A protein has these predicted regions:
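Short, basic, low-complexity termini and linkers enriched in Ser/Thr/Gly/Pro
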Residues: 2-28, 33-37
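Sec/Tat signal peptide C-region and signal peptidase I cleavage site
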Residues: 38-42
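A sensor for short, sequence-defined functional sites
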Residues: 43-637
């Protein structure tokens, strides 16, 4: 009963001690009370048992047995009732069964292997992998659903299944166990994240090595605002062989250097292009003076002649398609497109490096090399005094722009000498700039013409890329959500892109910008930052405050006072400084105009959870300043 508060445990004990209940009634009572209590604490499920048992009998073959039993407490946990497992021609589902029990332990549904469905992928995808799945909607709550299945894997043991019994917020774990049995001569490495327990290594009666890990009573994680991503908080264990055989290739994962040697063996020789294409590339670039200009020309060619398509073929999806094939077909995945760009650069004499990276994990395990930590490939181009990082799956991005999914991430640079652990650059907080110039022409009835000129740079630029492809109607709807202008009518709206900057130039009319009361106008000082909210109070916050990306918002606002009105009340200048950021607000009258300047710098970083009340106060002050009004009064004649 460790999941329940002490007073609830005591009440349960007293009821059970004094009541005459059958075994089934006791079980039902406990299940119902458990569900009610956990529902009151917003928990949606309990993993009763999560078991992974891997039996590896050689470098090329393993049987993986899984058992998952989960009690789903309410509708919020309904998706946890579904079953899904990844398969391929080398990972076969050989056994499956499932069952659903109600709160009394009565079996209300059995699930057969014949009921599983197989995913149907788009015909445009070149892919070997598929998924077997079953979707189940609980008829009542709570219910317990149990799945057991077996995967037979051969010729692809570059790593063993990860152990991650906790996969979502508001889900606790009662018991979880992982066991890996392997030949003694097969060196197996492991790494633990967010786990205090240790892996036990022993030998069984047959002389095989046995690695085992047990976890119990894991509390549910809460989805708290401004906290680390869930994937960085989950308990997780990695297991992988040091030396491997993978789809007929041989390699080592002793360290990242050895991993890089194997990766290089997959791409070496795949960058050859036909002579006719090479001549075309020289015609395109020979007259250009600098390497950067040549790279730009080839990057634009990549954009115009290729498109992204997922390709999970060739050495388990790890080997890129030959550059000549990508050139001919016009499509490829991140591996194929990056390799094709590498090939074009090589033709014109510019060296580059193939780089593997994760778009989800900012940090790789420096002392534990494994393929599964990465899910993406980009290209690195060393230049004198600079290094370009090319995103080849989306060449619509400005050349060399390091987008949010990879900025600051660890990566592995692959070359003939092996893998090198590197980190991509991240833009300074102040470089993620939104600069707004606004003029508000107010009339005596509270109506206003608002001209808006906004520049979005870098990280803020990424958020508004969708504007570039929207039609006029959708652009207008988006702008209306961005601004604090009641009854906004968008008259004109232009959207321009220049490198990693998007500019929005718009004219907005409002018949009720200011509120009229008698002889007074109450005028909002800031027509933008709509929806700026403060986080909720959390008395028992679990996580430190995490601000992944900092930014700078600068506003220059000019308000023209209507003829016949004078200022009765005006906000005072304010400056707010905290570890998380700084905010300054200034306002002054210049003739018939009021000039307002806002500057908010949010600082990326991790801050102790004890500072959360201070953080809320900081955000409330900013929200309050943005919401201030100037009071205008009709002049006395």
């Amino acid at each position: 009963m460790r999941h329940l508060p002490f007073n609830v445990q005591r009440s349960m004990f007293n009821v059970l001690r004094n009541a005459t209940l059958s075994k089934r009634e006791r079980s039902m009572f406990i299940s119902i009370l458990l569900a009610v209590t956990l529902h009151a604490t917003a928990q949606k499920a309990v993993v009763e048992e999560s078991v992974v048992d891997v039996v590896c009998d050689s470098r090329t073959h393993a049987i993986q047995n899984f058992r998952e039993s989960t009690t789903i407490l309410n509708e919020q946990g309904a998706s946890l009732a579904h079953f899904v497992c990844s398969c391929s021609k080398n990972d076969k589902l050989t056994a499956f069964k499932g069952q659903v029990t109600d709160s009394s332990g009565r079996v209300i549904r059995k699930i057969k292997e014949s009921e599983l469905q197989r995913t149907e992928y788009s015909p445009y995808l070149a892919i070997d992998d598929y998924q077997m799945f079953f979707e189940y909607t609980p008829p009542v709550y709570p219910i317990t659903i149990t799945y057991e299945w077996t995967i037979d894997s051969h010729d692809n043991l570059i790593e063993f299944p990860r152990f991650c019994p906790q996969t979502d917020y508001d889900v606790s774990v009662k018991k979880a166990a992982y066991t890996l049995t392997a030949p003694k001569e097969l060196a197996v490495r492991h790494a633990l994240l967010n786990i205090d327990n240790t892996v036990n290594v022993s030998e069984n009666a047959k002389g095989s090595q046995v690695l085992s890990l047990e976890l119990s009573d894991l509390p549910a994680l809460k989805d708290e605002p401004y906290s680390r991503p869930l994937r960085e908080r989950l308990p997780m264990a990695y297991f992988a062989p040091t030396d491997f055989t993978y789809y007929g290739t041989q390699g080592s994962l002793k360290d990242w250097r050895e991993y890089g040697k194997w990766e290089y063996s997959l791409i070496n020789g795949s960058e050859v292009l036909p002579d006719a294409v090479c001549q075309e590339l020289h015609q395109l670039t020979d007259a250009l003076k600098t390497d950067r200009e040549k790279i730009e020309a080839l990057y634009q060619r990549l954009e115009k002649t290729t498109r992204y398509v997922a390709v999970l073929l060739g050495i388990g999806g790890q080997k890129p398609a030959p550059a000549a094939n990508v050139c001919k077909s016009g499509f490829g995945d991140c591996k194929g497109l990056s390799n094709y760009m590498r090939a074009m650069l090589k033709v014109v004499g510019i060296p580059s490096n193939y780089v593997t990276i994760s778009t989800t994990n900012r940090q790789l395990l420096k002392d534990f090399a494994s393929v599964g930590q990465m899910n993406h490939v980009i290209l690195q181009v060393p230049l004198q005094g600079d290094t370009l990082w090319l995103e080849c799956t989306n060449p619509q991005l400005p050349m060399g722009y390091v987008h949010d999914d990879i900025a600051g991430h660890n990566a592995i640079e692959v070359s003939e000498t092996g893998g090198r652990f590197v980190q991509l650059p991240v833009y300074a907080d102040s470089a993620n700039l939104m600069h707004s110039k606004i003029h508000i022409q107010l009339d005596s009835k509270g109506a206003a013409d608002v001209s808006l000129l906004q520049d979005f740079h870098n990280w803020q630029y990424e958020h508004y890329i969708p504007l570039l492809k929207m039609d006029e109607k959708d652009r207008h709807k988006t702008l209306q959500r961005m601004i604090r202008v009641p009854q906004a009518e968008i008259g004109r709206m232009d959207v321009r892109e220049d490198g990693a900057t998007i500019t929005v130039d718009a004219e907005v009319k409002s018949q009720r910008y200011a509120t009229t009361t008698g002889q007074r106008l109450f005028v909002p000082i800031c027509p933008i930052h709509n929806g700026y909210t403060t986080p909720p109070t959390l008395p028992n916050r679990q996580e430190d405050i995490y601000l992944e990306a900092g930014y700078l918002d600068k506003d220059e606002i000019t308000l023209t006072i209507p003829e016949g009105y004078e200022i009765e009340a005006m906000p005072k200048d304010q400056t707010v400084e905290q570890p998380f950021g700084t905010f300054s607000f200034t306002v002054k009258r210049e003739g018939s105009e009021v000039r307002i300047q806002n500057s908010l710098l949010m600082k990326s970083g991790t801050y102790d959870k004890s500072q959360y009340p201070q953080f809320i106060d900081f955000m409330k002050k900013i929200s309050g300043i943005y919401s201030q009004k100037i009071v205008l009064r009709q002049s006395k004649s």
